Structures are given as C-alpha cells and as structure tokens.
Amino acid sequence: MAKKVQKKLPRRKEEFTYHGYKIDELRAMSLEDLLPVMPSRARRKVLRGWTIGEEKLLSDIRSNGSRIRTHQRDMIILPEMIGREIEIYNGKEFIRVELQPESVFHYLGEFALTRRRVTHGSAGIGATRSSKFVPLK
C-alpha cells in the first residue's frame, strides 16, 4: 500500500555549445579561426577593425581589471569576455551585466536597454469630464 515516491532529480544543464564548439574551444581559437564561426554581421564588424574605444575595452578585459565600465555598446561579445561582469552605459546609468556563454557574438548594447516600458498611472482629478465634480478632501 505504501507508494514509492520518486524524487525528481534536478535537471542537468547541458554544456553550452555554439555551432558545435564548446566555450573553452572558442576561447582557445584565434580571432582568424573564429571568423568562419561568427554570424556575418559580427564578422564584418571584426574585419573592419576595432575602434580606439573597443581596443581599450579589450585591453582592460585582458588585463583582468576588477571593474570595467564602458560606453562601447556596439562592441561584439567575444569568447574571451564570457564570465566577466561589465557595466554598460544605457544613456542614464551603468547597467551591470554578467556575460553568459549564450551571449557570445551579440552586442553589448543588447543587454543594457536604453528605453523602459511606460507604466501610466490613473488619471488625475479634472482629467476626465466625470471627475470634474468629485469633491476634494
């Protein structure tokens, strides 16, 4: 009569792969070896060359700086950046973002949104015709 209760095992998170490459394999590749793996938009940006700001950001990441703040929203997330915390400027403040393996070859700006959703409140007194005659307290 006693039923055996099976414990649900936690789901095993599979290791992230990008086009069949694990993140460690992507990190070991040189930039020239990464080009065929990249999406075309990221590949064209890399082939154009880095700007001065992007080169500075890459050197900061490679030098293991503890706090990295940047305005370079159009920088491609490279495999060597994965696992780092970067603060990205959204026009008003710096948004702290931890770069996950799933974000490889995306732009930094995709993770620090510049606009927020508008939440309208209720209408004020006198805003509608029916609320003109509501007695004020």
UniProtKB/Swiss-Prot annotation:
Gene Ontology terms, MF aspect: rRNA binding; structural constituent of ribosome
One GO-annotated biological process of the protein: translation
UniProt GO cellular component terms: cytosolic small ribosomal subunit
Keywords, sorted A to Z: Ribonucleoprotein, Ribosomal protein, RNA-binding, rRNA-binding
Residue ranges of coiled coil: none
Domain of life assignment: Archaea
Disulfide cysteine pairs (residue numbers): none
Protein family (similarity comment): Belongs to the universal ribosomal protein uS19 family.
Known function: Protein S19 forms a complex with S13 that binds strongly to the 16S ribosomal RNA.
NCBIfam families assigned to the protein according to its UniProt record, in alphabetical order: PRK04038.1, uS19_arch
Protein's UniProt name: Small ribosomal subunit protein uS19
Organism the protein comes from: Methanospirillum hungatei JF-1 (strain ATCC 27890 / DSM 864 / NBRC 100397 / JF-1)
Gene giving rise to this polypeptide: rps19
